[in-house]
């Protein structure tokens, strides 16, 4: 964040809260600190993923989001295993479970969002959430191909990310843009399913 301030770049920080690092109190302190520091820096609430957070911890994030009326961001439905384990734990997919906690009442976004149902798409659309696709990471980790064409058809905004160096060999946004369209066409079995402007 300090480097962004030095260069005049806009920066959005997102907490990666989980059962093993930081605490809701620390996240709240960072949220208040960075959102007052400079108009170029914003800090959004977030947590790593449903499977790395206890239900109690997720409730605290949701309560914070309601208190500050702010969006929440997290890794969501990245792998089939994640989805199946969430269904075994709570009887719902990750988006449905998080929605039941009121997590996205003020919007937000999901990173990856590879394995989703029609009901999950309804959650994203209803809360005006963003999907942040990470095709290089999903390819490296064999997580699957995100249904980008479905998101576009349902008017769910899609952003492109890299995930991070631990799960992506190359943090090149131009490569990610190519992968988004190329993998989507492969999934749809239609070379015209995504045009250049999309």
Predicted segment positions?
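Metal-coordinating catalytic core of metallo-dependent amide/deamination hydrolases
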Residues: 2-117
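Short, acidic/turn-prone active-site loops that include or flank metal/cofactor-
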Residues: 16-19, 78, 135-139, 164-166
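Glycine- and other small-residue-rich loops at beta-strand/loop junctions that grip anionic moieties
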Residues: 47-50, 113, 140, 162, ...
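His/Asp/Glu-enriched, well-ordered alpha-helical/loop segment
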Residues: 100-107, 149-198
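C-terminal active-site-proximal or functional interface alpha/beta core segments in diverse enzymes
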Residues: 110, 115-118, 139-145, 170
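Active-site neighborhood of phospho(di)ester-bond hydrolases with catalytic His/Asp-centered motifs
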Residues: 110-113, 132-134, 159-162
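Long hydrophobic segments that form regular secondary structure
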Residues: 120-128, 134-140
